[in-house]
């Protein structure tokens, strides 16, 4: 008699515990985790091209001393998939060994404000 009441309760407990386990989400993997070498990333927006002029000037100057790194730079026109790292565009970011080592975001007045931090990282 007691088994008739216990058996259905055990089935319900196992069924409900299986449901809660299936709702656990795996840890979200960042796109930075896929970058294992020094990589320059530039996030651009054609609607804000006037804000990007110092970035382009800085990149042209940096290309003289670091042509290989600038040539391998990746340019994105959307921040889709990068929301955890990028708040606004334009953004110039240097990633090394899955870590952001330099990030310059938003409106920058002088190209030197971009060149100096990048030179520091790229010269290593």
From Swiss-Prot:
Main location: membrane
Lipidated residue numbers (N-palmitoyl cysteine): 19
Membrane topology: Lipid-anchor
Lipid attachment locations (S-diacylglycerol cysteine): 19
This protein's UniProt keywords: Cell membrane, Lipoprotein, Membrane, Palmitate, Signal
Cellular component, GO annotation: plasma membrane
Subcellular location: Cell membrane
UniProt-listed PROSITE patterns: PROKAR_LIPOPROTEIN
Domain of life: Bacteria
Signal peptide positions (record): 1-18
Entry protein name: Pal-related lipoprotein
């Amino acid at each position: 008699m007691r088994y008739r009441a216990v058996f259905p309760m055990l089935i319900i407990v196992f069924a409900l515990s299986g449901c809660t386990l299936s709702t656990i989400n795996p840890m979200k993997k960042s796109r930075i985790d896929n970058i294992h070498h020094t990589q320059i990333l530039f996030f651009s927006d054609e609607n804000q091209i006037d804000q990007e002029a110092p970035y382009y000037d800085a990149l042209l100057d940096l290309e003289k001393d670091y042509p290989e790194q600038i040539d391998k730079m990746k340019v994105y026109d959307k921040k889709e998939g990068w929301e955890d790292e990028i708040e606004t565009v334009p953004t110039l970011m240097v990633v090394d060994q899955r870590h952001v080592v330099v990030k310059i975001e938003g409106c920058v007045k002088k190209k030197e404000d971009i060149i100096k931090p990048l030179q520091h990282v790229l010269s290593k």
